[in-house]
Amino acid sequence: MNKIKFFAILLLISLALGFRDTGLSGLQFQAYAQSGNAHEVVFTVPVGENGIHYEGVDIPEMLTWGPAAFTVAPDGSFWIADTVGGRLLHYSPAGNLLGKIDLKGLIVGATDVEAAKAGIWVLDQASMPPKVIRLAEDGAALGKYDLPPGLHLEDGLTGIALGNRGELLVEREGDAYVTQFTDATGNPVEAMTTNGYIHKGGLFAANASGLNSLTPKRGTILAGQLHIEVETEYDLGGMQILGFGPQDDFFVALEELALNPDTGLQVDQTVRHYDALGKYMGVARVPIAEQYTYVQQGLAIGPDGSVYVLATRPDRVEVWRLVFTQSLDSILYEPPLTSNPAEIHDESFGVKACVSRNTIISTASSYRNNSKYLSSTNINGACSGRQKPRYLGGAGTYSSVSYDWGGFDTVSGFNGYMYPNTYKAGDINTTEESCSRGVDCSGFVSRTWQLTSKHSTCTLENISTQLPSKNDMLRGDIYNKCGDHVVLFSSFGSDGMWDYESTTYNSYDRVVYIYSKWTRFSGYNPRRYNNVCP
């Protein structure tokens, strides 16, 4: 998602003409009418050497993740970031593999990609500091630029986009803050930040009122001189400008939220199409619940005006072309009319002193802000079965605490194991090695909650209570998915949330403080530690 494409765009649908101009077959239209979720599979990419890779598959207490981004080039070809495999994959409009670019040694983790006349831009959010690189189609490096302070992970870095002249833009908190980083030729310029995108001299932005506001189902789209009010059936978690067309029409991605007490957070992501005068033209649904793994940048607009989705499956990924209509049926959970709000009980028997939220967040911050010199032995020394965290290069001072599967180290403990001892920093392999130190996702939350023993993502549920509403989240609460991953909630963001977590996601391989959109936490449960102070 987060794609700004200034390409020609065709009208996708016209109900007024009885779908005569849509190009849909009778079978395609029937499927669409029945499900409200129509799409065309453009092509399929396998898993493996000739395709994409996943990490953490079928491993308890390990997040499964895969490709982070894709984009459509001006010639209609597709670029897919095989983030786990450390590659860019280039496909023709028909899905034929045109080439592969090996990114190992250039970046830590490819988290966004854009195709411009100046070259192929790749965002690396996992490196220290984060950076962008510019590549030729044959993989030759044309430029490599560190992002300055203010454009880092802890500042809300979420993606990159292209301006209408081909200049590179850096996005924070979606489209809440957009900074021009280069000119159209790819040369860095003095940073200029706006609260949205500039298109033909006008400011375009989409903002939800906020889950903790008095109007959580409302939002506003600013389109130059136009103000478009949006009201949704369910809570509006976020909105973002997706892209523009040649007639100044534009697309907006929305996320509606609901909490199912049995299955966790539900996210309905849709794309709305507006003409230059702000007239609503149609809507299409992105099947978030069907995704095998979350794709951070999973929407793109092509030169033919189509909206594409990168859909993940256990044995493949598919590139879909969305089909638009005038309206969609709701798919989110509706609580029974007779239901009463759930109460939050303190079930921590025998515990004398509660843990304050300030203590929880202070502990989390101490992991993220830790600074430690790591020797070549700490980084590359012998440690059978260990897989080194990807952000670690040569000897030097690194911030944070490394991810270590099964790890439960305190900050001071980790630092002491590094020096004067000579243990190894982190292990992203899924076996416990006595020679490596660090902390995994549930070990990190266990420490922030001041627990004396490590809990798993599943046993954390034994000492916490599920919240009756996603809007009730406070600092120090968690979003948890038993057997998979857990994050520590910090605050609501512009169109998503801020959290602390120890994770291998996006090749971070350490404790990070990041901003994410709600789609990332589809299927997670909001929970509160039973012994947190009121």
Task: Locate the predicted segments by residue.
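...with weaker cross-activation on analogous glycine-rich loops/strands in unrelated enzymes
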Residues: 451-512
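Eukaryotic scaffold repeat domains enriched in small/polar residues
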Residues: 22-344
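Short beta-strand-to-coil "C-cap" segments at the C-terminal boundary of structured domains/repeats
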Residues: 319-330, 490-492, 527-534
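Bacterial N-terminal signal peptides
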Residues: 8-18
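N-terminal capping segments
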Residues: 343-440
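Mobile, glycine-rich extracellular loop/lid and propeptide segments
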Residues: 437-446, 466, 486-489
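Bacterial N-terminal signal peptides that target proteins for export
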Residues: 1-8
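Low-complexity, Gly/Ser/Thr/Pro-rich intrinsically disordered linker/tail segments
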Residues: 339-341, 515-534
